[in-house]
Amino acid sequence: MSDKTLTRMDLSEAVFREVGLSRNESAQLVESVLQHVSDALASGETVKISSFGTFTVRDKSARIGRNPKTGDEVPISPRRVLTFRPSHLMKERVAAGGKN
């Protein structure tokens, strides 16, 4: 397993090399795509990217939790959480170590 992290800059550089846009245009394209995804998720929409996976926003209701150290009950407030479900193709690719 690698400890490398893929960044916006890495994505922009990949678009620059593979698509042929200028570095500035590549960075703008990546920013635009990420902004659209962020906006959709912030408004509660589901984002489905074919052969990659699905991002969804779920509302979790209030509940009573427990402090693991003390055993005291603690109220947990309602919140929205972001979830990602990878596609079957992505699961297979990760399981194969990215060799597909």
Swiss-Prot record:
Keywords: DNA recombination, DNA-binding, Transcription, Transcription regulation, Translation regulation. Disulfide bonds: none annotated. GO terms for molecular function: DNA binding; structural constituent of chromatin. Pfam families: Bac_DNA_binding. It comes from the Bacteria. One of its GO terms (biological process) is regulation of translation. One of its GO terms (cellular component) is cytosol. InterPro entries: Hist_DNA-bd, Histone-like_DNA-bd_CS, IHF-like_DNA-bd_dom_sf, IHF_alpha. Heterodimer of an alpha and a beta chain. NCBIfam families: himA, PRK00285.1. This protein is one of the two subunits of integration host factor, a specific DNA-binding protein that functions in genetic recombination as well as in transcriptional and translational control. HAMAP family: IHF_alpha. Belongs to the bacterial histone-like protein family. This is Integration host factor subunit alpha.
